[in-house]
Amino acid sequence: MTLMIERPCLRLMRRALAAASLAALAACTTPPPREQQPAFYRSLALAGARIDAESAAGMISAYRRNHGLPPVTVDPALQQEAEAEARRMAAADRPSSADAVKQRLAGAGIKAPAVNLSAGYHTMAEAFSGWRESPQHNRTMLAPGATRLGIATAYAPGSKYKVYWALILAGP
């Protein structure tokens, strides 16, 4: 009878040892890396979220090339203007007048400014799609003389829009 009692105990110990070994091995492996979400799908409806201006310029440049136009590059001065305009709109909780912004930019010596001001898009993909579908916004992205841009968003948590957008394109 002693042998019958020892066998089930031995089997139980083997199973416990196997389970412990598997658990130890599992603890040593690293989980697979999480896939990084492309910048154009990243939500900008969060505090501290910033648009990837270089990625946006690449997307707009590809669109322009498909229409026989030259690419655009991020310009630090236009980037600052876009950031300031996006913050102004978020603070006022309403989009600004594109004509007023264009006049201000032209008065500051910026050559042939074209401006998209909008609100409510949470990702670059949404904004780009919306701008392509809007004749006025599409004309801005396809401004023939544009060679540089600034693009920015500002988050307004209490606003129905949440995210305000400023895209400024200009000539050389």
Name the predicted role of every residue range:
Residues 79-127, 141:
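Short, surface-exposed glycine/acidic/tryptophan-bearing loops
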Residues 1-28:
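Sec-dependent bacterial lipoprotein signal peptides
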Residues 54, 58-62, 76, 80-87, ...:
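Solvent-exposed, polar/charged alpha-helical surfaces in well-ordered, non-transmembrane soluble domains
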Residues 66-80, 93-104, 138-154:
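Surface-exposed patches in mature extracellular/periplasmic domains of secreted proteins
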Residues 23-46:
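Bacterial Sec signal peptide processing site at the extreme N-terminus
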Residues 12-16, 65, 138:
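Hydrophobic alpha-helical segments, especially transmembrane helices
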Residues 42-53, 65-74, 87-91, 113-119, ...:
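Second-shell loop/turn segments in exported
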Residues 124-172:
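Disulfide-stabilized extracellular recognition modules
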